[in-house]
Amino acid sequence: SGTTQENAGIILSNQDTQKWKIEKVGAAHDFFIQNAGGDIALKIDQARIVTLPAQPSFQVRKSGNQDNLAANDSAQTITFDTEVFDGNSDFTGNSFTAPVAGKYMLSINTYLASIDIDAAYILVGINTSNRSYYRLVAPKFTGDLNYYGINFSVVADMDASDTAYVFYQQSGGAAQIDLAASNGTHFSGYLLG
């Protein structure tokens, strides 16, 4: 520890076991808080930009279409197979698991193709352990559509170990609607606090 060294800091310990280190590092004067293993919990650079490397955050997308979605008025899980990023490794399979209780910003963007106007409704939603959020469309257009986008964001209250996943539900019409991957079907989220 010290105040004038290039790498100056404070070590917090309990009975001679290092628990946390608060340190100013290098000529850039970046400020770090690290755990005993050296993992950075918080970084503040000289421009006052704060980063939290392990902050729960993710974005996933589809690498291929999910074709001919069922039209039987039951929810079906939208599958995701490509992680763009997963800041704390909390996304597995097709769902995000909250590592801690808090408010989470969750967003879904879907690109639907071959929309059937005979469907009574189409909805895309985010289901969490506490509740469901969704956007509903009653496709009363003059003819079938080549494509249609459904997207929304929500701030969800989640407890530790709660899960969130995306679902699709269609009532009536033909099972002809495809969830296209190439034009931006993705699911993302991050911990607000």
Regions found by a protein language model. Name each.
Residues 1-40, 56, 62, 66-67, ...:
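Self-maturation zones of extracellular/virion spikes and adhesins
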Residues 42-193:
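Extracellular jelly-roll beta-sandwich "head" domains, especially the C-terminal globular C1q domain
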